[in-house]
């Protein structure tokens, strides 16, 4: 199986850009399905956002486009059989996630990337990431989550007021 997303447009500061994604369900839980939807989880300037990606089948592959804000520091995708809160089948890469740390138009990583990487993988924090992982997911430890928070503090101290509430949960 593979998953790929590529830029399909250009950033305009503070705006969005269009990305194209390609998903191959072969060998996964969604192989052979006739209708799929993609769910995108974005951490945009210290706020979680979710959206859907309408997918169209092209041979064995599924393709779609989505808009990503310029300030998006973390992005994850999950694919499912229907657009419901309780789909009968999902693919999140066996709880390993389809997760990425994007760069802005200048090639720089953005504030929030470390915090999002840690918080997303610790759903017990109630990080507004929905039901990305299965009930069998083993989340990262408090120590690992704190390490990611420490990295955020080290690299982006000027944004501390945005993530102070998250730090109090450890």
Question: How does the language model describe each region?
Answer:
Residues 1-170:
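Glycan-association/targeting regions that enable binding to alpha-glucans and other polysaccharides
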